[in-house]
């Protein structure tokens, strides 16, 4: 099985990379589970004081939820969301700062995940987009609350 989340630890920080570049790092249920577990593991590691969160490749930080996977699930979004660990909750529980290294686009749930970070660093190609209404998904990770506080 391919590692959907890559983790590197060194010098007090943990680098977490979403690793589905061909799918624009779309957040499949398995990727969300692996990401939440990786963040929880770093919270338990006393040596890790900072997390850097990024996406593999240069096209996308993450395009948000995997819409192909959601379309194949009976019950759609809510059933899919309940079945998985919540990476945004795990990010919120981390005691140190989280740096979002946003390479490429952060769309819908990816935009929400970026807003769960304490500091965002972008590239000239970084773009943020909220397409929740277009795809019929509610912003359940706090976009409407966090965005207005920027």
Model-based region annotation:
Residues 1-54:
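Conserved CoA-thioester-binding segment of acyl-CoA-metabolizing enzymes
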Residues 16, 53, 66, 113-115:
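Hydrophobic/aromatic residues within transmembrane alpha-helices
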Residues 19, 25, 64, 104, ...:
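Conserved phosphate-binding and hydrolysis motifs of nucleotide-dependent enzymes
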Residues 45, 94-95:
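Acidic-histidine catalytic/liganding microenvironments
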Residues 55-93, 134-136:
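Glycine- (often His-adjacent) and acidic-residue-rich active-site loop
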Residues 87-93, 101, 107-150:
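CoA-thioester-processing core
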